C-alpha cells in the first residue's frame, strides 16, 4: 500500500488494559437496570464481555433492550449512559494500566514521523482517563482523540464505521492510506467497513484469558474482519508495519 499516512489506534484493550475494569462497573449498573425492569437475569463482568466486548454502553443498552424485550425512554437512556460514564471513568482513573510494550512502540511510531490518533467507541472522557493514567496522553493531541459516543451527533458505536470515517475526514487522510489496530470483532468490523487496513491485536486475550483464546481471536479477526495482520505483542508492530507498506 506504500507508506502509511496515519496510524489510528483503538484504546480499550489495545493501548490500555481497561475493558475488564470498565465492564466491572458496567455489570453493577446493568444489574440495577435488570432489577428496575423486573428481569431475573444478572450479569458479571465476564458475561457482559462475552456478549458486548467492543461496544460502548449506549450500544450495550440497545443490545440488552433487544435481547430482553424491554424499552428505555430517551431520558432513561441518557441517565444510565451518564451514570456508567461516571463510574467507569472513576475506576479507570484509578486502575488502568497500559498493554505490554505500548509506550515503547508509540515512542517508535513517533520517532519515525507517523502521525497518530485514537479512534474509540467509548466516551472521550473515559478514553482520556485511561490514557492519562497510563501516561499515554502525551502522544496524542486532545483534538485527535475521537469517540463514537461523544464526537458524533447522534452518537454511534462500533461496528458502525461512522467514527472511522469521521476521524479520517477530520484528519484529512484517505481511509485507505491509514491503518488501525483493534482487539475486538466490533472494532475490526468497523475498520473493515470503513476500508481501513486493520492489525488485529490479540495479546490482550493471552493476558486476560488463554493462549487458545488468543489464537482463536486471531483466526476470527482475520477470517471474518479481513484483518491484514495479527499482532500478539506490541513489539511486533514495526515489522508488521513494514510488511504492510511493502505489500
Language-model segments: residues:
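Asp-based, Mg2+/Mn2+-dependent phosphohydrolase catalytic module
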Residues: 1-4, 107, 124-247
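N-terminal helical cap/lid subdomain that shapes the substrate entry/recognition surface
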Residues: 2-11, 15-103, 107-112
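Conserved phosphate-coupling serine/threonine residues in phosphotransfer and NTP-handling enzymes
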Residues: 14, 120-122
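Conserved SAM-binding loop
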Residues: 15, 116, 180-181
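Short beta->alpha linker loops
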Residues: 21, 55-56, 97-101, 122, ...
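A generic structural signal for short
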Residues: 49, 93-94, 116, 152-153, ...
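Hydrophobic, well-structured mid-protein blocks that either form specific transmembrane helices
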Residues: 116-119, 136
Amino acid at each position: 500500500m506504500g507508506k502509511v499516512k496515519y496510524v489510528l489506534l483503538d484504546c480499550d484493550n489495545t493501548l490500555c488494559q481497561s475493558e475488564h475494569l470498565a465492564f466491572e462497573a458496567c455489570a453493577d449498573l446493568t444489574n440495577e437496570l435488570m432489577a428496575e425492569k423486573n428481569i431475573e437475569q444478572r450479569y458479571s463482568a465476564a458475561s457482559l464481555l462475552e456478549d458486548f466486548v467492543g461496544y460502548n454502553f449506549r450500544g450495550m443498552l440497545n443490545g440488552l433492550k433487544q435481547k430482553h424485550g424491554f424499552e428505555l425512554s430517551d431520558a432513561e437512556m441518557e441517565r444510565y449512559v451518564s451514570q456508567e460514564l461516571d463510574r467507569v471513568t472513576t475506576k479507570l482513573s484509578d486502575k488502568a494500566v497500559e498493554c505490554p510494550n505500548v509506550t515503547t512502540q508509540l515512542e517508535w511510531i513517533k520517532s519515525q514521523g507517523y502521525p497518530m490518533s485514537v479512534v474509540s467507541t467509548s466516551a472521550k472522557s473515559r478514553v482520556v482517563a485511561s490514557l492519562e493514567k497510563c501516561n499515554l496522553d502525551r502522544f496524542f493531541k486532545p483534538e485527535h482523540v475521537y469517540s463514537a459516543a461523544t464526537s458524533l451527533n447522534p452518537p454511534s458505536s462500533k461496528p458502525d464505521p461512522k467514527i472511522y470515517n469521521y476521524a479520517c475526514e477530520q484528519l484529512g487522510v484517505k481511509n485507505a492510506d491509514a491503518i488501525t489496530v483493534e482487539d475486538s470483532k466490533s472494532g475490526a468490523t468497523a475498520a473493515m467497513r470503513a476500508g481501513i487496513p486493520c492489525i488485529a491485536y490479540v495479546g490482550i486475550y493471552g493476558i486476560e484469558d488463554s493462549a487458545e483464546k488468543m489464537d482463536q481471536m486471531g483466526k476470527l479477526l482475520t477470517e471474518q474482519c479481513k484483518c491484514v495482520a495479527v499482532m500478539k505483542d506490541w513489539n511486533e508492530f514495526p515489522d508488521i508495519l513494514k510488511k504492510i507498506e511493502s505489500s
